[in-house]
């Protein structure tokens, strides 16, 4: 299956070449494919905060490359570059508050910086580390796809209907995708009859990005309104909900695209299985439960306006980007380190003690 998956990779949103970070502007998809080139850390931080690049793994990868750009500038400034670089770590860390992968990538880059030896080519070493973060995410995607397919096959081997929410595909990662990686792999195995994609308001990551990715791969896909998810579960024979994650707490609670929680509640009511697919870098053992995860809110214009035109009266707006799905609503968490069924704190701790693959 691995060779099939690698051959099927058709979409990428992150490229590093010619000493610059190149990002596919996800705000414009699918109508326009425009690549933005970032040559300094401020541009990378802005690209993250303004949703040019999104998806927790992709944000972490972009931040790692952003530090390489920052380091190049600081080294050129001369003495005191280590202290100045701390400002760049802070800038990138403040770009988005929720994705655990962002802080994981920054910490990994910091740790590599601290292990430098006299005579090392600092810039070359740190560039190699950022590339390794990118490549390891791609490898993790392939491994998770295989693990996820095994879970689906174990419970039902015939063709079936799946539901996903948000975008956890190639655009959100460094490779094949997390949730969409599993869905793509299941399709290659002849196990998917239909994929239903929630539009995922207000940024429409489902209808704009996920549907575009799956259609490009020839996966049978149908877009539905977010509010139709419960009705679909009742009438369309869906067997699995498969989603990604921005952050997973130590007890298995999952922060993900807003609307994931209510889908999980509906799935539990209808007896459907609920799968979360995310690399181990999305797990933060310093966060005991979902109550400890910082949850991002965004600007009012995302709900008040459509295509720049105000369509709602001037009223109070609350625009959370993510919500928390409690672990007891989740059947399985799939990572590159392994699979956790019916997650809890003990199982998550055991998973994270395994040999580091990512």
Swiss-Prot record:
Keywords: Amino-acid biosynthesis, Isomerase, Methionine biosynthesis. It comes from the Bacteria. It catalyses: 5-(methylsulfanyl)-alpha-D-ribose 1-phosphate = 5-(methylsulfanyl)-D-ribulose 1-phosphate. Its EC number is 5.3.1.23. It is an enzyme of class 5 (isomerase). Substrate binds at residues 54-56, 96, 205, 256-257. GO terms for biological process: L-methionine salvage from methylthioadenosine. The keyword GTP-binding does not apply. Pathway: Amino-acid biosynthesis; L-methionine biosynthesis via salvage pathway; L-methionine from S-methyl-5-thio-alpha-D-ribose 1-phosphate: step 1/6. The active site is at residue 246. Coiled coil: none annotated. One of its GO terms (molecular function) is S-methyl-5-thioribose-1-phosphate isomerase activity. InterPro entries: IF-2B-related, IF-M1Pi, IF_2B-like_C, Initiation_fac_2B_a/b/d, M1Pi_N, NagB/RpiA_transferase-like. Pfam families: IF-2B. Belongs to the eIF-2B alpha/beta/delta subunits family. MtnA subfamily. HAMAP family: Salvage_MtnA. Catalyzes the interconversion of methylthioribose-1-phosphate (MTR-1-P) into methylthioribulose-1-phosphate (MTRu-1-P). This is Methylthioribose-1-phosphate isomerase. It comes from Pseudomonas entomophila (strain L48). The lineage of its organism: Bacteria, Pseudomonadati, Pseudomonadota, Gammaproteobacteria, Pseudomonadales.
